[in-house]
């Protein structure tokens, strides 16, 4: 970046705080989710100027440790989400526990299976990501609950033999574990282990409530209070001064890239086959750094407009708040907001969307 390391993240954190956010999150990726072939001002607008290289990502735990100092004391810091396989769970347990101490009890460990793009190109085994995830969660819990005693645990992926873990919780409290889960097996694991559920690619409120019920059933089966698990979600927000600005942003190549991350079944509902195959599983199998410009343009040209309106919350601030309220009525309690308006190719319209976006955030606080 042309700015000093951490400037953009800290500025974003301050802006989020000023608009009433009570948590700030960073992702965990070795490379970007936007193909480098379209990471240009033509497609990314002002975002390309702020971040000239989409594949130059800071290590998130180091970044969060830096942000922990000077942040408002009430602000929680989270990672959304770290990989269960690319990082050894003992190291993840250590990193999250460290951040919990640095933030005085305000750290959140978001975790999921990760994506193919951040694992397979780097030599990380990707044939059984869910099994690795389950073992990683069990390992983290085993270390945190060890009370300093040596831990030995059999595992096909992360065996422990006389493993020591003596970092203490902050005032008896470990970081909350928020799990990004979508499929049946992941939803069951969420119910067994998680403090919160934070899906990323569910596109309809009815699908959300159905999956939430599966999480709560799994929690009950595991002897846990099903209502103790926080129903959350990560969603992009596209807003602007008027409907025309919003529609222009929704039709941009970068925003439509998000639709490539939803499964082929979601496309089929709109009568269109996913360009990567009818049975394409979704964001976990996208490898953006290998996609050339023409491929991206041909794929995004096929995105049904109606699907885009399912993938993100979009519209005027009032319309966005109404859409979130519908999800709230289906069980959503905590929303992680991605400001998608910033990637409008028009610099003027991206900047103009900042006030409507702030209005959205203020409206969400009132729900």
From Swiss-Prot:
Any single GO BP term: lipid metabolic process
Keyword tags: Lipid biosynthesis, Lipid metabolism, Oxidoreductase
Record's keyword annotation contains Membrane: no
Keyword Protein biosynthesis: no
Gene Ontology MF terms: oxidoreductase activity, acting on paired donors, with incorporation or reduction of molecular oxygen
E.C. number: 1.2.-.-
Classification via InterPro entries: F420-G6PD/mer (IPR050564), Luciferase-like_dom (IPR011251), Luciferase-like_sf (IPR036661)
Family named by the database record: Belongs to the mer family. Phthiodiolone/phenolphthiodiolone dimycocerosates ketoreductase subfamily.
PANTHER family from the UniProt entry: 5,10-METHYLENETETRAHYDROMETHANOPTERIN REDUCTASE, PTHR43244
Function: Catalyzes the reduction of the keto moiety of phthiodiolone dimycocerosates (DIM B) and glycosylated phenolphthiodiolone dimycocerosates to form the intermediate compounds phthiotriol and glycosylated phenolphthiotriol dimycocerosates during phthiocerol dimycocerosates (DIM A) and glycosylated phenolphthiocerol dimycocerosates (PGL) biosynthesis.
Protein's recorded name: Phthiodiolone/phenolphthiodiolone dimycocerosates ketoreductase
